[in-house]
């Protein structure tokens, strides 16, 4: 079991902004995960992996692919209070879910 969080590289987020957006996405997807999967994920150490996506379009494509596969997702758009325009999509979490299921959607992405 793992969760993969994809963050955009094309919008110039600072390190703090990146960390916050990844955290928001992780928690958002977690909230939509069934209790049994959450227990298993926690028992296995709550693995989280952060990867790169190069565009808004790619973020949305991965989100739709995960939804079609029945995986929990959390797609985050920034509030626009600091670095980004309001509503800018920043990060997508997929899972927690079985490793192989998440890897089908994110396995080709580079680590952050």
Curated annotation (Swiss-Prot):
| Keyword Isomerase listed | no
Q: What is its EC number?
A: 3.1.1.29
Asked whether the keyword Secreted is assigned, the reply is: no
The record's keywords, sorted A to Z, are: Cytoplasm, Hydrolase
Stretches the record annotates as Disordered: 64-99
Compartment(s)? Cytoplasm
Q: Which Pfam families match?
A: PTH2
Primary location class? cytoplasm
- Lineage, top-rank taxon, reads Archaea
What GO molecular function annotations does the UniProt record carry, in alphabetical order? Answer: peptidyl-tRNA hydrolase activity
Any single biological process term in GO: translation
Spell out the reaction equation it catalyses.
an N-acyl-L-alpha-aminoacyl-tRNA + H2O = an N-acyl-L-amino acid + a tRNA + H(+)
Family listed: Belongs to the PTH2 family.
Q: What's the name of the protein?
A: Peptidyl-tRNA hydrolase
Q: Which organism is it from?
A: Halobacterium salinarum (strain ATCC 700922 / JCM 11081 / NRC-1) (Halobacterium halobium)
